[in-house]
């Protein structure tokens, strides 16, 4: 009897699962992070922004413009059309506005066009200018009030406070070494804290002491805060002091000072806490939070009946708090109202809630705890009560009452998703528009003006365009494979506007925090400078309305102490209050705990407790990790560094022609593929009526017919072939949301990133030294690891000053054989096989007309001859771009296609390359066990098993022990057993097969109990000395292929100023011979080799042309001249006003001629290469060179010097 139980993944794949935990909760939809947020933006976000900014009134108050509602019209293009036409998938937005004339009472309502709003596709991406983009969610500090505690050099604790808004000025409190408290308003110089208290309208020292109670730090601060100007009251002086800090050097009056302070903190238009900021402040300052664990210094009674709730000297425990909580929420319990001075920033009474407790430092001393009262959630600005309560908390910290905050705690960091980021951008545009509307209101005639005339939509359109086009968070979607797409949509970045920067982020921010548990994946993060700043959402996590990440837990009943199936989603803040058991904790059938002592989590500690202490239990072990990490079998047996690489490398797997699902999976593959957006999903249940490679038709139960079109070989963002193949047969019954067609890297509706080759862990002739991989030729012959890359090339025919460019077959000086694959219009035919340098689109551009002589003008007038020439600017296949022409698209103005200004025709040619696995390609398993292919060995030479089967891949066993990714060995053995038994298995992370399960399955498959076998050498037939581990592992081919990296240059472009070769494959550059390489040649004394490297091969402009000429003619190479870099140095020194001359050995000045002065030495290499054939025309070539090249050289100084077969305008991608 086999271990585990059978589970169906979709209709087409069955796996034997080793999971021992019942799944209480289904995975949420994995792209909801994006789609739900955008839906919120459309439903509520847009309205919120309009409500914030409208109504807009003019300065006199005669006119007022109000928002009534908005609607989106039908998008101009569908998703596929937008992709094809390089357009944006967007819907026109019309806003209904109401203009009221307050004097006449006349109302005008009008629908105003507000630009196109980009729409989200069903899978959570946007199409902008034809490219698929993702808006990455941002992880930022939540608005709220934060307290920090630090120790100075004397060991005394110093506290600081920051009040952070969503937008607006910061407020900071701090103590110094002398125990004086200060405030900084909006990052300015500090003032005594009591100045801010006085500005709230609490003027005298005695009032301040009454309000906050006597303490050392308060007394020191009052001593520091002296009354300077007796003409002003203390309140007026305080307000002026703050004004002086904010606007130094400006004349200050009480009124202007008051209005400035009001505008900075208390004006809802300028200061916004957002609902989350208000929620955090209310939570932090409320007495519910602050009383817990304190000793009461007064008796608390019911205000209605006088019944005692808690006596003096009671310690507030959970039980006491349960009784107190309802009273603390009441508006008549322990409320105190202070009447501020009329000169304060706000004259309204300030109501707070106050309760006295004993100090933790001096138990005899009473400390007053003050909360901000009950402020409604829609009050998004600060109130004086907030300021006073936050100061009270700050003073209480000195008495060890209250807690400091950890900024890296996920209760203090929140997620800004697409909807919110887009809303902020929309708000910026609308605020800019508001200014224009106000101005226009005062200029135009109030009787005739309409809403349309007041609105200028340019700022709104511009700010949305800018966001999608150039924001750091709007990213080109990763489309190597569906897992990459899905992960990109679930990514959380701490970078971007309003976030951190790479250089300023320290270790603390990047580190794994205990609150990441079940919220952010501790494994999946990039390896480079962004490590820890870019994270991935955990698989079961959701984001609440405030932007905090919540994770699900099973509730444990308080009465029975049994685990229920009731699920609660907890934020990191809430989770801190509970003790939580792990998902692997053994349970009885009735839900009670088997053991008397349970290992559980409490905040950052692991504790052992009895079952009655447990509040919650994890839902499932894989809730800790992200989707990509959850796809790694035996993750629990891998070292975390290698697991990180494994998670990241799966996203780089190349889509293969015929992928196979992994024999050893985790059960996550089906959902990952289903939710990625690459699979074709049934919209409704029904029966399949027709299937072919391009279309599937399904008849619903109510008789309607659904038609689904499959994607065929579409080029993805990363030049991969995205191709869909049917997953259903004629007559199949389909349920809603079934996978009816596999996308790329999918098999039977599951993610299938690679293949399942037979792998042996053994060395072979040193071919797998240092992570190199040795492959069998079978993998090449049978196209096991063959993928398709599709690249697109564009050619545009524009209007130039000298006339329009023309796409044509008539090209100057081009032989017929070069045109054999072009059609009558000069465009390559679909299906043609093209190689480097072949013409794809024939195009000619008018050349400059030379001055005509009188006779030529006469001839031109008589015969109408075209006197001006054209030059060939055809689109050619770039280096390494050869392949089969897969598709050609032609867009013209006449056909009504939208082209950029000045373009008449655009041709796009798609070239597909079939790439077999070869030496130099990168491969990897799912455990970070990556390597490059070092040898492809004939099948007959490969080591073979006792039954004669040659192995497919040999990996070096030395790659395992030091890296500690043992998961690959367990996968290898289980994979071998699964293939033998003809089954697929699932081993979910942290809850899958253990070692015993693996060996049991190996035994049942009839494999030797050590999992090893004798291996024979394919060349000699001799057995190797030791037994070898052989099995089946899911192995991937990664996107880093040698074809994309290999590069060589003989002749190519040079940099304009230095005249040295460019660098890099994209620029067709040379290899840099650097400082240290020069030392090496110097050490060898290779003087002539070094000289030619520093002159002809680099920047001796004249010398290299002459050298080329000499090589072509077979003559001796002349001596080199002066390198251009020397001339650049001289010119730089001359530009500093130094008189630099170059002298020879006899102290005679050497003339450094400018490049375009003597152009006979700047012959184009094109003409030189022809010289070899036509040396007799040498004189003529020089003559024409002298006259014509002067003009040409000025124009072409920045052109690459290239032989005849180099194209002038390089294909720029």
Curated annotation (Swiss-Prot):
Alphabetized UniProt keyword annotations: DNA-directed RNA polymerase, Nucleotidyltransferase, Transcription, Transferase
Q: Show the NCBIfam families listed in the entry.
A: PRK00405.1, rpoB
Please name the HAMAP family in this protein's record. RNApol_bact_RpoB (MF_01321)
What is the protein named? DNA-directed RNA polymerase subunit beta
Spell out the PROSITE patterns in the cross-references.
RNA_POL_BETA (PS01166)
Q: What is its EC number?
A: 2.7.7.6
**An MF annotation (GO) of this entry:** DNA binding
Record field: catalytic activity: RNA(n) + a ribonucleoside 5'-triphosphate = RNA(n+1) + diphosphate
Which SUPFAM superfamilies does this UniProt record tie to the protein?
beta and beta-prime subunits of DNA dependent RNA-polymerase
Q: Which InterPro entries match?
A: DNA-dir_RNA_pol_bsu_ext_1_sf, DNA-dir_RNA_pol_bsu_external_1, DNA-dir_RNA_pol_su2, DNA-dir_RNAP_su2_dom, DNA-dir_RNAP_su2_hyb_sf, RNA_pol_bsu_bac, RNA_pol_bsu_CS, RNA_pol_bsu_protrusion
Gene, per the UniProt record: rpoB
Query: Could you tell me where the Basic and acidic residues compositional bias lies?
Result: 1171-1199
| Enzyme type, top EC level | transferase
């Amino acid at each position: 009897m086999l271990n585990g139980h059978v589970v169906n993944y979709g209709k087409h794949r069955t796996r034997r699962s080793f999971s021992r935990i019942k799944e209480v909760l289904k995975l949420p939809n994995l792209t909801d992070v994006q789609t739900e947020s955008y839906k919120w933006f459309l439903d509520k976000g847009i309205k919120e922004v309009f409500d914030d900014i409208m109504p807009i009134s003019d300065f006199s108050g005669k006119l007022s413009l109000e928002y009534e509602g908005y609607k989106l019209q039908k998008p101009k293009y569908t998703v596929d059309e937008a992709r094809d036409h390089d357009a944006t998938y967007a819907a026109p937005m019309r806003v209904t506005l109401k203009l009221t004339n307050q004097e006449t009472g006349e109302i005008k309502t009008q629908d105003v066009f507000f630009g196109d709003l980009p729409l989200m596709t069903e899978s959570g991406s946007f199409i902008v200018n034809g490219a698929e983009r993702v808006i990455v969610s941002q992880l930022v500090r939540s608005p709220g009030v934060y307290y920090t505690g630090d120790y100075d050099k004397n060991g005394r604790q110093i506290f600081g406070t920051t009040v952070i808004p969503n937008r607006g000025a910061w407020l900071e409190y701090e103590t110094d070494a002398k125990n004086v408290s200060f405030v900084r308003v909006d990052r300015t110089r500090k003032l005594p804290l009591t100045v801010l208290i006085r500005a709230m309208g609490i003027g005298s020292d005695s009032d301040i002491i009454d309000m906050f109670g006597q303490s050392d730090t308060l007394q020191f601060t009052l001593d520091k805060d002296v009354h300077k100007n007796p003409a002003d009251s203390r309140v007026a002086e305080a307000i002026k002091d703050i004004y002086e800090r904010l606007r130094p050097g400006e004349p200050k009056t009480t009124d202007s000072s008051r209005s400035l302070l009001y505008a900075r903190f208390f004006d809802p238009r300028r200061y916004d806490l957002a609902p989350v900021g208000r929620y955090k402040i209310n939570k932090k300052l409320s007495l519910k939070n602050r009383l817990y664990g304190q000793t009461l210094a007064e008796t608390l009674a019911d205000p209605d009946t006088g019944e005692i709730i808690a006596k003096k000297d009671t310690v507030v425990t959970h039980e006491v708090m349960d009784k107190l909580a309802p009273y603390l929420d009441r508006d008549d319990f322990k409320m105190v109202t202070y009447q501020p001075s009329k000169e304060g920033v706000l004259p309204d009474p300030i109501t707070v809630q106050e309760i006295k407790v004993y100090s933790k430092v001096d138990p005899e001393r009473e400390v007053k705890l003050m909360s901000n009262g009950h402020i409604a959630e829609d009050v998004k600005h600060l109130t004086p009560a907030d300021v006073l309560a936050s100061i009270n908390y700050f003073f209480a910290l000195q008495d060890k009452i209250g807690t400091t905050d950890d900024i890296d705690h996920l209760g203090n960091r929140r997620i800004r998703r697409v909807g919110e980021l887009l809303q902020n951008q929309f708000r910026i545009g609308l605020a800019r528009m508001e200014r224009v509307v106000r101005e226009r209101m005062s200029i135009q005639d109030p009787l005739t003006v309409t809403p349309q005339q007041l609105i200028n939509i340019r700022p709104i359109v511009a700010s949305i365009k800018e966001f999608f086009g150039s924001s750091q968070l709007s990213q080109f979607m990763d489309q190597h494979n569906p897992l990459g797409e899905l992960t990109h949509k679930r990514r959380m970045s701490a970078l971007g506007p309003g976030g951190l920067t790479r250089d300023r982020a320290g270790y603390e921010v990047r580190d794994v925090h205990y609150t990441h548990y079940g919220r952010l994946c501790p494994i999946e993060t990039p390896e480079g400078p962004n490590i820890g700043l870019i994270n991935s959402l955990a698989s079961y996590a959701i984001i609440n309305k405030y932007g905090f990440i919540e994770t699900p837990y099973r509730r444990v009943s308080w009465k029975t102490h049994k685990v229920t199936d009731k699920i609660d989603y907890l934020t990191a803040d809430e989770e801190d209050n509970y003790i939580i058991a792990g998902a692997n904790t053994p349970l009885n059938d009735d839900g009670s705990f088997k053991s008397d002592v349970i290992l559980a989590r409490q905040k950052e500690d692991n504790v052992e407790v009895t079952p009655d202490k447990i509040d919650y239990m994890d839902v499932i072990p894989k809730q800790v990790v992200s989707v990509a990490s959850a796809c790694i079998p035996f993750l629990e047996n891998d070292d975390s560094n290698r697991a990180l690489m494994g998670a990241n490398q799966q996203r780089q797997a190349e889509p293969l022609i015929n992928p196979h699902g992994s024999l050893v999976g985790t059960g996550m593959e089906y959902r990952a593929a289903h939710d990625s957006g690459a699979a074709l999903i049934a919209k409704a249940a029904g029966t399949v009526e027709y299937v072919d490679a391009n279309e599937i038709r399904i008849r619903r139960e109510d008789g309607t017919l659904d038609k689904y079109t499959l994607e065929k070989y579409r080029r993805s963002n990363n030049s991969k072939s995205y191709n869909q193949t049917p997953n259903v047969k004629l007559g199949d019954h389909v349920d809603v949301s079934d996978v009816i067609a596999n996308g790329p890297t999918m098999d039977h509706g599951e993610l299938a990133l690679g293949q399942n080759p037979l792998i042996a862990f053994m060395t072979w002739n040193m071919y797998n030294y240092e992570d190199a991989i040795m492959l069998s030729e079978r993998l090449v012959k049978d196209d096991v690891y063959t993928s398709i890359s599709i690249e697109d090339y564009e050619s545009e025919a524009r209007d130039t000053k000298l006339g329009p460019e023309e796409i044509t077959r008539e090209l100057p000086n081009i032989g017929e054989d070069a045109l054999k694959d072009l059609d009558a219009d000069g465009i390559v035919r679909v299906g043609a096989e093209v190689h480097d340098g072949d013409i794809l689109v024939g195009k000619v551009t008018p050349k400059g007309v030379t001055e005509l002589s009188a006779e030529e003008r006469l001839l031109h007038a008589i015969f109408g001859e075209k006197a001006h020439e054209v030059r060939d600017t055809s689109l050619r296949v770039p280096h390494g771009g050869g392949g089969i022409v897969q598709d050609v698209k032609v867009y013209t103005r006449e056909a009504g296609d939208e082209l950029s200004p000045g373009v008449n025709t655009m041709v796009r040619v798609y070239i597909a390359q079939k790439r077999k696995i070869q030496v130099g390609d990168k491969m990897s398993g799912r455990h970070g066990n990556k390597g490059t292919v070092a040898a492809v060995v004939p099948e007959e030479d490969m080591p073979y098993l006792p039954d004669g089967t040659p192995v497919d891949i040999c990996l070096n066993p030395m790659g395992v022990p030091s890296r500690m990714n043992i998961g690959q060995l367990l996968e290898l053995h289980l994979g071998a057993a699964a293939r033998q038994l003809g089954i697929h298995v699932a081993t979910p992370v942290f809850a899958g097969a253990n070692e015993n399960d693996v060996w049991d399955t190996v035994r049942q498959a009839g494999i030797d109990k050590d999992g090893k076998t004798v291996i024979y050498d394919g060349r000699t037939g001799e057995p190797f000395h030791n037994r070898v581990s052989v099995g089946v592992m899911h192995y991937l081919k990664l996107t880093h292929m040698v074809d994309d990296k290999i590069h060589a240059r003989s002749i190519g472009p040079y940099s304009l100023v230095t005249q040295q070769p460019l660098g890099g494959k994209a620029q067709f550059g040379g290899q840099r011979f650097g400082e240290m390489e020069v030392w090496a040649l110097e050490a060898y004394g290779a003087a002539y080799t070094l000289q030619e490297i520093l002159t002809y091969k680099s920047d001796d402009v004249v010398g290299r042309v002459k050298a080329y000429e000499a090589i072509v003619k077979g003559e001796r190479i002349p001596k080199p001249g002066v390198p251009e870099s020397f001339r650049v140095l001289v010119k730089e020194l001359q530009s500093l006003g130094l008189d630099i001359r170059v002298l020879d050995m006899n102290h005679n000045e050497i003339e450094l001629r400018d490049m375009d002065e003597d152009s006979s030495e700047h012959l184009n290499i094109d003409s030189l290469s022809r010289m070899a054939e036509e040396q007799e025309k040498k004189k003529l070539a020089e003559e024409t060179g002298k006259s014509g090249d002067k003009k040409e050289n000025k124009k072409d100084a920045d052109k690459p010097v290239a032989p005849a077969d180099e194209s002038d305008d390089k294909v720029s991608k």
